């Protein structure tokens, strides 16, 4: 079965999804209404990390379990493989909040709880990033560690979506800044069928 390029699934990935830190939050907030209008709420999802200190004022959590998936959703729905992927990862111990971001357009969003997997997977993922891509990481750099965890969770999630989707849709992953971009070399190394986009902003990386 050939993948549907016209009705592709778009995932926008940033550490500022549902997490107001700097300018990227404003960029995402500004583009959300037109993106949701073009893609609808089933083909466009934002992905970020769960900031427990502030996420509750940014989102409305959406109920999702296997009963809802099997009894209230159709396998023909564009977002069925996305919901199934979330549930499969939850079964493996990954903390995930599935929600509606309370900004204009109300994009569906997926927030990963990095602490839910930090102790179990971080060292293995740091080793894999070095072995597979030659990218080193400091032992105790919290920011880099978070970027690695988020990157591997995004890669894992996209792999689950591809498996559940059975090649019905093309997938596009748009990553904002290096903090959300670790998934890019991992996706390429694993040869996942995902179109990737990287945008850098008014940061040190973007300017120089």
Residue ranges of model-derived segments:
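Catalytic cores of nucleotide-sugar-dependent glycosyltransferases that transfer UDP/GDP/TDP-activated
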Residues: 1-208
């Amino acid at each position: 079965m050939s993948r549907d390029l016209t009705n592709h699934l778009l995932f926008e990935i940033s550490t500022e999804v549902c997490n107001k830190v700097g300018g990227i939050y404003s960029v995402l907030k500004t583009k959300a209404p037109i993106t949701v209008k073009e893609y609808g709420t089933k083909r466009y999802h934002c992905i970020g990390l769960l900031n427990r200190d502030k996420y509750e004022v940014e989102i409305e959590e959406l109920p999702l379990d296997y009963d809802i998936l099997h009894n209230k959703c159709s396998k023909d729905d564009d977002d069925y493989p996305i919901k199934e992927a979330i549930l499969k990862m939850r079964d493996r111990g990954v903390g995930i909040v599935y929600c509606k971001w309370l900004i204009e357009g109300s994009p569906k969003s997926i927030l990963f709880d990095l602490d839910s997997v930090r102790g179990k997977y971080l060292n293995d993922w740091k080793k894999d990033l070095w072995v597979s891509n030659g990218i080193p990481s400091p032992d105790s750099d919290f920011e880099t560690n978070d970027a690695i965890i988020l990157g591997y969770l995004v890669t894992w999630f996209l792999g689950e979506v591809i498996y559940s989707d059975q090649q019905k849709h093309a997938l596009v992953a748009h990553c904002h800044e290096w903090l959300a971009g670790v998934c890019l070399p991992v996706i390429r190394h694993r040869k996942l069928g995902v179109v990737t986009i990287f945008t850098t902003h008014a940061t040190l990386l973007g300017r120089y």
